[in-house]
């Protein structure tokens, strides 16, 4: 199964940038890709000009897909306006989000593309961010039983956050394919230095993605064949 879950060591650290970069790199290599962001908070209305900067719009652009009500719904069926954890954002709108429904939707989406298509599922928030009233992002990816690409930033404190997330994934026997350090604009430490420290302490494969740069070609094998 050519499916990868893109998780974050924290919130707003570059998951979508990395997912979009990986999508473009895979497509450039000749591999068909379907990238999905099933849940998103802080999403403007489709009629709002700011929607073009949303995670959903960025992933559609990486696949050369137009922004329409249909493509948006197919990419991100659970969209919430408030920039809060999904369970809180849903409650504010009088809605609910059930883990079983989310997992079922993802399983259907994974099975839909033609054989050989790489399916990327981007999580929401950090690894332990509340997802529903009872479940976290970790529970979601464990239920899907998918290999994981963990995204870290390069900000001050990113090394500790990444090592904590790696330890959590290992404790729960999750297949961690690699860590990607996504450059944090204005960070005092180069992403390569952060990546070296994470690799040294955790003994895992670590890649770097610079802001304005693409996904490294040598890292495309993080997506199972």
Swiss-Prot record:
GO biological process terms on file: biotin biosynthetic process
EC number: 6.3.3.3
Pfam families for this protein: AAA_26 (PF13500)
Cofactor(s) this protein requires: Mg(2+)
SUPFAM superfamilies named in the record: P-loop containing nucleoside triphosphate hydrolases
Pathway note: Cofactor biosynthesis; biotin biosynthesis; biotin from 7,8-diaminononanoate: step 1/2
GO molecular function term, any single one: ATP binding
Keyword tags: ATP-binding, Biotin biosynthesis, Cytoplasm, Ligase, Magnesium, Metal-binding, Nucleotide-binding
Subcellular location: Cytoplasm
Active site, UniProt feature: 37
HAMAP family: BioD
Protein function: Catalyzes a mechanistically unusual reaction, the ATP-dependent insertion of CO2 between the N7 and N8 nitrogen atoms of 7,8-diaminopelargonic acid (DAPA, also called 7,8-diammoniononanoate) to form a ureido ring.
Family per record: Belongs to the dethiobiotin synthetase family.
Full protein name: ATP-dependent dethiobiotin synthetase BioD
């Amino acid at each position: 199964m050519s499916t990868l879950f893109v998780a974050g060591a924290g919130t707003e650290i570059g998951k979508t940038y990395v997912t979009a970069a990986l999508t473009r790199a895979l497509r450039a290599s000749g591999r068909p890709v379907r990238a999905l962001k099933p849940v998103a908070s802080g999403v403007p209305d489709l009629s709002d000009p700011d929607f073009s900067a949303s995670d959903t719009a960025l992933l559609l652009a990486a696949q050369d897909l137009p922004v329409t009500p249909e493509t948006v719904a197919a990419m991100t069926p659970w969209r919430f306006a408030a920039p809060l954890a999904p369970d809180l954002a849903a409650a504010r709108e009088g809605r609910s989000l059930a883990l079983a429904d989310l997992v079922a939707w993802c399983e259907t989406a994974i099975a839909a593309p033609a054989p050989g298509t790489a399916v990327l599922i981007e999580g929401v928030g950090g690894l332990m961010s509340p997802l529903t009233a009872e479940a976290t992002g970790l529970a979601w990816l464990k239920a899907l039983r998918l290999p994981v690409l963990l995204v870290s930033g390069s900000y001050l404190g990113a090394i500790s956050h990444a090592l904590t997330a790696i330890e959590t994934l290992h404790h729960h026997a999750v297949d961690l394919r690699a860590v990607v350090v996504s450059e944090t604009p204005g960070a005092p430490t180069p992403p390569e230095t952060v990546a070296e420290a994470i690799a040294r302490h955790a003994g895992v494969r670590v890649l770097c993605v610079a802001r304005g740069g693409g996904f490294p070609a040598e890292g495309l094998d993080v997506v199972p064949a």
